[in-house]
Curated annotation (Swiss-Prot):
Protein name as it appears in the record: DNA ligase
Name of the top EC class for this enzyme: ligase
Binding site for Zn(2+): 403, 406, 421, 427
GO annotation terms (biological process): DNA repair; DNA replication
Residues forming the catalytic site: 112
UniProt keywords, alphabetically: DNA damage, DNA repair, DNA replication, Ligase, Magnesium, Manganese, Metal-binding, NAD, Zinc
GO cellular component, one term: cytosol
Cofactor: Mg(2+); Mn(2+)
Matching SMART domains: BRCT, HhH1, LIGANc
Amino acid sequence: MTVKEKIEQLRLQLHQHNYNYYVLNAPEISDKEFDDLMRELQDLEQEHPEYKDENSPTMRVGSDINKNFTQVAHKYPMLSLSNTYSENEVTDFYDRVRKALNEDFEICCEMKYDGTSISLTYENGKLIRAVTRGDGEKGDDVTDNVKTIRSIPLVLHGDNYPEVFEIRGEILMPWEVFEALNREKEAREEPLFANPRNAASGTLKLQNSAIVASRKLDAYLYYLLGDNLPTDGHYENLQEAAKWGFKISPLMRKCQTLQEVFDFINYWDVERKNLNVATDGIVLKVNSLKQQRNLGFTAKSPRWAIAYKFQAERALTRLNMVTYQVGRTGAVTPVANLDPVQLSGTVVKRASLHNADIIEGLDLHIGDMVYVEKGGEIIPKITGVDTSVRFMIGEKVKFITHCPECGSKLIRYEGEAAHYCPNETACPPQIKGKIEHFISRKAMNIDGLGPETVDMFYRLGLIHDTADLYQLTTDDIRGLDRMGDKSAENIIKGIMQSKEVPFERVIFALGIRFVGETVAKKIAKSFKDIEELENADLETLINIDEIGEKIARSILNYFANESNRKLVDRLKTAGLQLYRPEEDLSGHTDKLAGQSIVISGVFTHHSRDEYKDLIEKHGGKNVGSISSKTSFILAGDNMGPAKLEKASKLGIKIMNEEEFLKLIS
């Protein structure tokens, strides 16, 4: 046997033993025998570097090389799931799917593991890339760190896997490992991790993969993407993936009825406490991939899946005082300051009270014993008061009437729960909040700038709005507190680089009320530049897919404000991308210009989302509901009877897939 053949043999043996131990939980050799094989392979690879392989089992030990992570675009967006704590909303989801498909379907029920999401790409049976969720469109390349996780295969078993595919899952830290890690940190008098999810996420982002390897992370894989997948069934594909070497949850179950779904939920609401990893709910997915494609996606999440989250834990503690925070939109949020209490693995000292109505409804008094819950929110919330122990309490909590920062009288818009400070041009937290939003990662992504730096620049009078950032020079900021030459240069470089940020993110960065990332993308697709957007009327805005009257009026109000128009003009002068680039417009036609189109039914040739893109590409507008202004309906199979009746009553043309594709060809 040649040296090369011996190395290959050892690699195959170690991959198999690794799989037996970490995935099947059925080791065939002792730890010492495994270590001996590993040492033999390490020695041979060291003596023969010409046979180096990035997917060798020796790569799992990690390295102490320090590096920054590069960002990688996801081939398929990593959207989050819509979630609920309500069984009624699970029923609503099931009914929506049944109505939309109008045919038999199965629901795959899975544990919702509480870790950090990962996307793994394999080519020719080898792991080539591991990327975090990031912002859903791009994430950090953490391949070297993921290679240290022994339950993730570097090389696949068998040969019936697709040539290229992606598999997604959750990186986890088992409870036992988490508790041991926190004991070590406590002994070193270091801050403890709040929960296993934070520990897993923090570990995955460490620069030293040798430390990552020592943390004993685990992984469950839960979704397969790509061409030429084994079957049309999600559940069936994962069973195949298990044969290739992936760790797939054995707790998955296919359900034929809603009652079976609830039986699964109710069983695991109790039994999950006996699992060795953290879980916080159940994920429900339509099993057929074809049916998934037909159901499509909303802007933020798939229509074919939902996460049911188990009810949050709650704790009882004392309310000491209520303080108030002013956000970038001027919204004033009351915050309860509490005696520290342990809740869901974290120490809670503050909780949101949301608005004046909540305070009034709870009949809060200073000194009350209050119930605190922590569900999906980052900040816990107060859900009740234990009035049975109410004695020696202080005064009743009353919502403030004036801004705690600038003293302006607060206002409350009709139909809204929040109170607002109207002084948007001179209230410090609003100004700083707008700038912090502008520079944030999902907006202009300006490296080197953070809340503390923004606060310092504002206090020193260097910036008063976002456009002032583009007037800064290294001389302006060099020598400021903790600001050396290199830091100053990096900040100015980051500001200059932000001029290349695309139109949709600049729109988001403006901070227009109710205009989030998704709406900003819709706007950027609908207008060729900021001037078109500034001059758009209410009807034009409402006709944009997923933009209702509330968002449309907010956009109109923003541009009706002269100071906002001047700010946008200054940003334009600074060189920001306030227009769609020519390459975005290439391939676009005006074949559907001026037409408002409703999509309904289940399609064969393309998904609903693909048809929406085609409509926009050819100058049309996607609208969600039928009206007298609808140009035509693009109808697939099983179009809803209510829409059919309304279209008939209004005399609106119904077009099938073939007719539509011919129209735009």
